[in-house]
Amino acid sequence: MASASFVKPNTLSSPWIGQRSFAHTSASSSPPPRVSFAIRAGAYSDELVKTAKSIASPGRGILAIDESNATCGKRLASIGLDNTEDNRQAYRQLLLTTPGLGDYISGSILFEETLYQSTKDGKTFVDCLRDANIVPGIKVDKGLSPLAGSNEESWCQGLDGLASRSAEYYKQGARFAKWRTVVSVPCGPSALAVKEAAWGLARYAAISQDNGLVPIVEPEILLDGDHPIERTLEVAEKVWSEVFFYLAQNNVMFEGILLKPSMVTPGAEHKNKASPETVADFTLTMLKRRVPPAVPGIMFLSGGQSEAEATLNLNAMNQSPNPWHVSFSYARALQNSVLRTWQGKPEKIEASQKALLVRAKANSLAQLGKYSAEGENEDAKKGMFVKGYTY
């Protein structure tokens, strides 16, 4: 695995950099020798870069269906279905066998159960994705737990055993991974919570790359709160500054990662709603200040926005060139229409798959900066924010 992009060393403040000594010399001395950094190279370096670029391809984004079984059960309950493995399998089969999905979707994040499941005809879901030119991914974190010593904040579990699990996921066909941790603005956030989130993401990213998986780095800044957009920007800049500091400390190769940030918006309970142009301006300002251009792709989460809102905001961010591929990694903002259409009825599978393609195509156009909200139905404009949302 290769190391991250480097900041120019300050040779005046550090006598030792990269195991090289810098002696201060007089003006008449010959120029100091060039510094060479040892780059860690692993067997997966080229593959990681190739995978990341494949996912960050024009007009395509990520379909996230990595909800835990409990969360998937809530989705099924909303249409009157029991939370059984058969029902979860049927829903995932509906999504992953949608004809033409690969035209708009480049990667799909799966829950562990889904990675090992197959269609009723015996074809693995991994093969369904590969045949559609979609890269299979896997959620690897083990959820959130209260962070002792913090302001009622949380930390993300799952580092124990991650290396061996990642190796198994790679053998099963996964080529990228996702780790979701959260930051709450109303809770501070505390310096402890931000550092814990950043360090955990960095360790996960390094372990993933060592095992052939492109890590999606996701410190979700929750929509909870009544704060203005300026406060969200302040917190986002702090969080991403810490994240990239620790990614570099852990020798993570920036060219072999993808980011899954929250858009910079006001808190969900703020009195004023931001326009897509304002969201784009604040979000791109944050990214340009904190994210190196070596990163190939920014795959936004929807975070409880309505389907139409998430698409409009993404479209606004693609009205001018960006240093990175700016796209989507949506769950609810792609699936909500599908569930409403399906209702668990076999005769509605085709209509449900068409509903998925409508949303996928809309976001594909938004990635290209060509989306228009004309013709969007009222259901697509309904917000999906859930306070304290858990995956």
UniProtKB/Swiss-Prot annotation:
Spell out which residues are annotated as carrying N6,N6,N6-trimethyllysine: K387
Listed pathway(s): Carbohydrate degradation; glycolysis; D-glyceraldehyde 3-phosphate and glycerone phosphate from D-glucose: step 4/4
Q: Name one GO biological process term.
A: glycolytic process
Q: Which UniProt keywords apply?
A: Chloroplast, Glutathionylation, Glycolysis, Lyase, Methylation, Phosphoprotein, Plastid, Schiff base, Transit peptide
What's one GO MF term for it?
Answer: fructose-bisphosphate aldolase activity
User: What is the annotated role of this protein in its UniProt record?
Assistant: Plays a key role in glycolysis and gluconeogenesis.
The family database entries (NCBIfam families) matched by this protein are listed as: FrucBisAld_I (NF033379)
Protein name as annotated: Fructose-bisphosphate aldolase 3, chloroplastic
